Structure formats: structure tokens, C-alpha cells
Amino acid sequence: ERLADFLNENLQIKILCLYNLDFIPNLEKINIPIILSTNIKDLNVNGFEELELDYFDFEEFISVSKKNLPINNLVGLFLQSGRSKFGEKNILLRQSFTLLELEILKYLALNLGQQISISKIFIELKKRLKTSKDSVYQAIKKLENTYVIYTLKHDEKKLQKIYFKDFGLRNNLCISKDFSHLFENLVLSELFKFKEEFFYNKYFNFYSQISKIAYISSPTLDIDLIKLRAKKILPKALELGIFHVIFITLSSEDNFFEQGVKFEVISFDKFSLGF
């Protein structure tokens, strides 16, 4: 009511913008256009058109960075800095997360791309701080609901992997090098553009049950080894009805067919900038 009164007293205000909402305000008496923003996934307001803005992708990073560098250097810089401000300063981590959330994120950073269970995380965390399994569960759900992490489900078993929405956050949480899984997270971040749910199994890093396309992160695998791997995963691709398998690499490129399945080998920069 106070907001409505304020707007009635200040008729020069033509648009109301409310940022970083964590609750739904009373907007019934407001008669001007309204823009609301939130980082909470399940905060929905009836009568509003919804637009989801993700962290920037590689193409946007190139535009924002304005650095005249070779494309491979830009990929390396993107891997290092990440997709948002979280990749810039450690102080933002302390300001944005509770101690429990930080400990969970540190564990996820150390185990990026690995199969993870809440029980496993809880057993590890209770060695360092006083907490409960329910608290860990709620904290993980909050991190997922605020676009910090992304849970990738196995296509058949009750297994999951957890990645970062901004892979640059991993670099601020963990000093150990894990280029293979960081590149995997990088590939996944580009797939977010499709607004589809992805799954994994032991054959494919990510695949869509809707588009029937599978993706395999292979940053340093050479073409001969990729072709050997393609032969091994071919039966599973045919079983799942997948007729397009994409290997994302740092620089290798090729195309070939096996029993009607297209295997495409493409560098990350062309994969990302080709959307």
C-alpha cells in the first residue's frame, strides 16, 4: 500500500522496477508497467510474462571482454574467468553464501563431474562442521533454486552429477586442476541455451531425449581415438534412437557416419559460436 501511495504521489515515475526479489510484493493497486527480477527459480508471479536470463555464454563473453586475442586464448580466458561476477573476487563468495553452502560448494568443486549423493556429501561435511542431513539437503536445493548449481540426472539409475551454472565459481573454490571436468562443465553451460533437460550415462556426457542428440566432452582426444570410441558407443546410440553424436574438442574437427549415425567432431569455439 505504501508503494502504491508513493507512486500516486510521484506521477513522473512511468515504470516500476524491483530487483533481487525474494518474496512476492502486493502489486494490486499499481497501474504502471512493472519489471521484476529475481534469482529464485520457483518465485512465480501470476499475470507476468517470464523471461529467463542466463549467465553470459562464450559469444557474449567475447563481446564483453573486448580482447583482440586468438580464439584459443579466448577459450582459455573464458575457462579461467567464468560466466559471471562470481568468477572475479573471493569476497563475493563470503557475501553470497552461508558457511554450510560454501562447504557444499567446495566439495562439489573438488568432485566436479563425479557421481554424487547427498548422503556422501553429508558424511564428508560432518567431519568439519556441525550439521544435519536435512540441512545439507535444503542447502543443495537452495543452491539449485538460485541458479548456482545444476543437477544432471542419470537416464536410468537414481544417480546424479552436479555442475556449476557458472563454471568460473569452481576456480575460486578449489586450487586443484581438473581441466577435463572443467571443460565438461563449459560444454554443458553452452547447452543451457536449448532450455532442455539433459541426462547422462556411461556412454554420453550429456544427451537430450527430445532432440535425440548426444554430446561428449573430449578436449584433447585425437581423431583416431575418437573414432575408436565412436564404434564402442554406436550400439547404445542406436538403442536410444540417437542419430547425431557430437564430440566437442579444443581444436580437432571431423565428420563420419556409422550405420546411419552421424558422428561430428567440432572445436568448442565453432560449437559455441555456431548456435
Task: Name every feature range the model reports, one short phrase each.
Residues 7-8, 141, 237-238:
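Structural motif
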Residues 27, 133, 226-230:
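Conserved strand-to-helix beginnings and helix N-cap segments that scaffold or border functional pockets
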Residues 1, 11, 154, 159-275:
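A cross-kingdom feature that marks ATP-driven nucleic-acid transaction machinery
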Residues 5-27:
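Conserved P-loop NTPase "ATPase switch" module shared by AAA+ and STAND
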Residues 16-17, 33-35, 244-247:
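A structural signal for isolated positions on well-ordered beta-strands in alpha/beta enzyme cores
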Residues 20-24, 36-43, 203-205, 249-255:
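Short, polar loop motifs at secondary-structure junctions
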Residues 30-33, 37-115, 119:
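Interdomain motor-coupling "hinge/lid" segment immediately C-terminal to the ATP-binding subdomain
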Residues 89-212:
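Accessory nucleic acid-recognition modules appended to NTPase machines
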